């Protein structure tokens, strides 16, 4: 068995210590705010299988840094809007925590849904299929 310098769980813990985490009930109340953009970073198959938060924008985890960087040929204009609050989510909150920590390192302000889509659904958040 290999020995890692830092485990994935430790990386998530470190990320969570430096990022803004939003609880499900709070994001439910923010859904209708036009200044809030919910970004789903799950794999497209997860979205198709489990559904998605209405109005969320899908951005695959592997492309986030490139879609946000205005100098990247892959840049998406949705990430260039001033005054918007971007809230990222995945299934459990691990990938989105790491994503938001990386984006903060890039100078991009964002938050993440603390417990992810699985808790969103359990706590009564609306889901589209």
Q: Whereabouts are the PLM-identified features?
A:
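Active-site flanking residues adjacent to catalytic metal/cofactor-binding acidic residues
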Residues: 39
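Short, surface-exposed ligand- or partner-binding patches at beta-edge/loop junctions that are enriched
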Residues: 89
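Rhodanese-like catalytic fold shared by cysteine-dependent sulfurtransferases
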Residues: 1-36, 44-85, 94-129
């Amino acid at each position: 068995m290999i020995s890692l310098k830092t485990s994935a769980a430790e990386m998530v813990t470190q990320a969570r210590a430096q990022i803004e985490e939003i609880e499900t009930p709070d994001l439910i109340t923010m859904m209708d705010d036009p200044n809030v953009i919910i970004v789903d970073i799950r794999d497209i198959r997860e979205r198709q299988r489990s559904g998605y938060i209405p109005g969320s924008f899908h951005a695959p985890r592997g492309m986030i840094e490139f879609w946000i960087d205005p100098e990247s040929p892959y840049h998406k204009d949705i990430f260039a809007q001033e005054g918007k609050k971007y809230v990222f989510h995945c299934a459990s909150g691990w990938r989105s925590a790491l994503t938001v920590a990386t984006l903060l390192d890039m100078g991009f302000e964002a938050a993440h849904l603390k417990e992810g889509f699985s808790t969103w659904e359990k706590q009564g958040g609306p889901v589209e299929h």
